[in-house]
Amino acid sequence: MPKHSKRYNEVRKLVDRTKEYDLNEAVDLAKKVATAKFDETVELHIKTNIDYRKSDQQIRSTISLPHGTGKEVRVLVFAKGEKAEEAKKAGADYVGAEDLAEKIQKEGFLDFDVAIATPDMMKIIGRLGKILGPRGLMPNPKAGTVTNDVAAAVKDFKKGRMEIRTDKTGNLHIPVGKASFEKEKLTENIKSAYEQVLNLKPTGVKGTFIKKVVLSTTMGPGIKVNPATLTQ
């Protein structure tokens, strides 16, 4: 079992691991335990009642936060001609077609956070599935990253729209801002993310959809949150 740092052990004492905090308390506590020398990311972890073995119960979609995540998002676009120009004007960091696919495949280029493609590019990037898929970077219509409206997609992802997907245990891990954010902005982001997740409940899920909610910072302990206080 890995040893935690002295700093981690000190801040962990501030959190009652047996208690479910209301959202207001949890945000205060998250900001208080974020004592690292960098601006820690605040993450919302949601444990669902999804049966990941059933394909119709998996969540893969996009959400947007009213105040963004505080992270500069690097966007790569696979497009040609007019669509490539639209992507560049919209602020894409990298735009190309076969050249980009080759750079990824042969040079291991992965210096981006989101990959968007026009539908006609899928035959070119299909061979990149084994590289981009495991990293959650493969363009996908469900995630809004395969589209002809590349300009709108680039702007949305630059503003903070992000893809979310359940992991193999049915959990969601969502960055909701930085510890330096004002409390009100963090709270609004958390509530917005949670409400959007509720709207993504697969029809096949029986009983309670959300089993547990935890808030944490990059280097801090988990803080259990009472789900009822996320919709008040």
From Swiss-Prot:
Classify the source by domain of life.
Answer: Bacteria
InterPro entries recorded: Ribosom_uL1_bac-type (IPR005878), Ribosomal_uL1 (IPR002143), Ribosomal_uL1-like (IPR023674), Ribosomal_uL1/biogenesis (IPR028364), Ribosomal_uL1_3-a/b-sand (IPR016095), Ribosomal_uL1_CS (IPR023673)
What biological-process GO terms show up in the record?
regulation of translation; translation
Cited Pfam families: Ribosomal_L1
Which of UniProt's keywords are assigned here? Answer: Repressor, Ribonucleoprotein, Ribosomal protein, RNA-binding, rRNA-binding, Translation regulation, tRNA-binding
Quaternary data:
Part of the 50S ribosomal subunit.
Function, as annotated: Binds directly to 23S rRNA. The L1 stalk is quite mobile in the ribosome, and is involved in E site tRNA release.
Q: What is this protein called?
A: Large ribosomal subunit protein uL1
Organism of origin? Thermosipho melanesiensis (strain DSM 12029 / CIP 104789 / BI429)
